[in-house]
Amino acid sequence: MAKLVAFHEESRRSLERGINALADAVKITLGPKGRNVVLEKKYGAPQIVNDGVTIAKEIELEDAYENTGAQLMREVAAKTNDVVGDGTTTATVLAQALIREGLKNVAAGTNPIALKRGMEKAIKTIVDGIAEVAKPVEGDMIAQVATVSAGNDPEVGAMISEAMAKVGKDGVITIEESKSLQTEMEIVEGMQFDRGYISPYFVTDPERMIVQLNNAYLLLTDKKITSIQDLIPTLERVARSGRPLVIIAEDVEGEALATLVVNKLRGVLNVVAVKAPAFGERRKAMLQDIAILTGGQVISEEVGLTLEDVELTMLGEASSVTVTKDTTILVSEKGNKADIQKRVEQLKQQLAETDSEYDKEKLQERIAKLVGGVAVIKVGAATETELKDRKLRLEDALNATKAAVAEGIVPGGGVTLLHLASRIDALLPSLSPEEQTGARIVASALAAPVAQIADNAGAEGAVVVENVRAGDFNYGFNAATGAYEDLVSAGIIDPAKVVRSALQNAGSIAGMVLTTEALVVEKPEPKPAAPANGGMGGMGGMM
């Protein structure tokens, strides 16, 4: 495949055109009065969205050079979304401002490497400033953060605030699509995993097809149980105690399963068998989690235990067990609090060390199941288009809330960056002249989010920036009401982590674009001409 190569100014200008095409489509969504963008879909109805990263992912440009710029800009949004799940539009607006001013200076002959160095030093000063001014989240701030992030939707704010209050900061909140018009929340207490009963003959409530057991013993093993002989000593002990039994094993089959079913149907023993959750090493870890939560032991040959050795003291205990054909929920207060806390600390350590997004998600889920539970928000709406938009807003709000809990909050509406820009003046004397130019570019770009929020609200961006700059740190423009006020008192707050990530990712991409001297893209292949349609052949003569 042949390649096209562009150099110097030509390469940078092509990148800038692509960057502007994407940024101009994304930035109109910023703020409470941000506009919507309609995305055409190959199949189904067009999608109406107000979410920066979703718009960025849809943009592909015809010109290969310009498309490269658009893809770089998409990376800013995607990276910010991966780290904090919100702030993608702010990152895009900042990156566009940094690149626009930076390219003017590179074209005028400034050394791009020195320019980049100055920008990096200025951004570090601002990042340190964000950490200094951030305040911990307290009271109704969680609802305020969620409301702002969901595009000023107080209902969303209240729901996420309630979910956070119920499951705690280590809990897991998931967002699903609802079958109804209402948006509702469901709290799952205790430990839930995606494995149901092995046989429907175990059900205790035939109408709902579920198993409901109270004050049950739990036998946990990583073995496959096929012979009933292994289980007889345990079954006899549990039967004498008069309590139900839940068996969680790799599998229960053959003679063992048949005997358990017969005993259940005859009323000799109230029992249910469930396959252990997950696979391989993760299965062993999850069994251990269940054991710690229920005060039991995992019967495993790795620790020298077999099913014949089981005593009642080795079994876990649960105050309530609910098993459907797909899920199991265990509620137990029998676990040792110190052991549970130790296990949670261990999992948090693993969470800090892993780079895999999948592993992070699974570890976070395991922590949540140990400490408090899971909240499921089911999003409802009148049309599918509205449902998709509402779900995206809820996801943004949830991510912003988690970020606020992690690193605290700062005044919103873009004013934190605008007010911190003055700190760059103190940095200038220590920089070389060309580095100073880079630092000044950052200082002027920090006004871009405030200006864009004002423009989207129908105000004059440059005027708003000057008015806000004259006020104290919390003072800013409330685009929802058109008033200048103390934004923290008005509940307009941003998570510090979102503001920090947006600035760092914007600076990273801007630095790369400014130091680009050549651009290599694939040469588009000419489309083959459509073949001419042949005429119909004549009919042969009849004999």
From Swiss-Prot:
UniProt catalytic activity: ATP + H2O + a folded polypeptide = ADP + phosphate + an unfolded polypeptide
Family recorded in the similarity comment: Belongs to the chaperonin (HSP60) family.
Cellular compartments annotated: Cytoplasm
Domain of life: Bacteria
Name this polypeptide is given: Chaperonin GroEL 2
Function: Together with its co-chaperonin GroES, plays an essential role in assisting protein folding. The GroEL-GroES system forms a nano-cage that allows encapsulation of the non-native substrate proteins and provides a physical environment optimized to promote and accelerate protein folding.
Lineage, broadest ranks: Bacteria, Bacillati, Cyanobacteriota, Cyanophyceae, Acaryochloridales
GO BP field: protein refolding
Keyword Phosphoprotein: no
Keywords tagged on the record: ATP-binding, Chaperone, Cytoplasm, Isomerase, Nucleotide-binding
GO cellular component: a single term: cytoplasm
Subunit organization: Forms a cylinder of 14 subunits composed of two heptameric rings stacked back-to-back. Interacts with the co-chaperonin GroES.
Pfam name, any one: Cpn60_TCP1
InterPro entries in the record: Cpn60/GroEL (IPR001844), Cpn60/GroEL/TCP-1 (IPR002423), GroEL-like_apical_dom_sf (IPR027409), GROEL-like_equatorial_sf (IPR027413), TCP-1-like_intermed_sf (IPR027410)
Entry binding sites for ATP: 29-32, 86-90, 413, 478-480, 494
